[in-house]
Amino acid sequence: MNQFILLTILLVTVVTVSAQDDLNAYREEYKKDFLSDPRAPLKEADLQYLDFFPELPKAVITAEFQLTPAEQPFEMPTYSGVTRTYRKWGIASFTWGPFSSNLVLYENMTNKSNPLYKDYLFLPFKDNTNGETTYGGGRYLNMSKADTEDGKITIDFNKAYNPWCAYSDGFNCPIPPLDNKLPYAIEAGEKMYKGEHKKVKNEK
């Protein structure tokens, strides 16, 4: 029995360390993406001001997923006042403590014909950390259509990130729809930016 308990503890430790390593690698890649995109609001000197919650294992959720093929494209407003064309792709349903929750995943209709982004799904959301420990305008998650197979989807809030509007003016960041407002705090993913908010030329 003692050997079984020891092996179980070792296995859990290995899995936990592996998950943390994966998340650290993901966040390093996330930072590098700012440097490879000339439109990005952050430069190398700014990356030190990015801040993240520690990994939260319970923030990795397996949700039920239902496609919404009858939904028509609509104009999603952004914080700059322009709109972006999206379509509801499906609904993820899960529990968080005592709460039963739904989040809508969206397909970007502008990028649909681009082979690099045709499988991309967008999950904007708000929660009770906004304006306290995270950006007031909500956060985003990137998903793939392949993630929605077999009627389930894994949502990892540890990978939640800020819209570029969190760092600078001049960007057209979609406003998370009311359907995606969670009535509790998700203390996982990216926190509020610690650097100075910038002003840049409006994106096109």
Task: Please name every model-derived segment.
Residues 122-163:
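Acidic, glycine-rich flexible loop segments
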Residues 110-118, 143-152, 194:
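Short, surface-exposed linear segments at secondary-structure transitions and domain or protein termini
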Residues 20-73:
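Start-of-domain marker
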Residues 161-204:
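Extended, aromatic/histidine-rich regions of cofactor-dependent oxidoreductases associated
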Residues 21, 44-47, 52, 72-88, ...:
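Extracellular/lumen-exposed scaffold segments
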Residues 76-137:
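Mid-length scaffold segments of soluble, non-membrane domains
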Residues 65, 105-107, 127-129, 157-161, ...:
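A mature extracytoplasmic/lumenal domain signature
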Residues 1-22:
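Bacterial Sec-dependent N-terminal signal peptides
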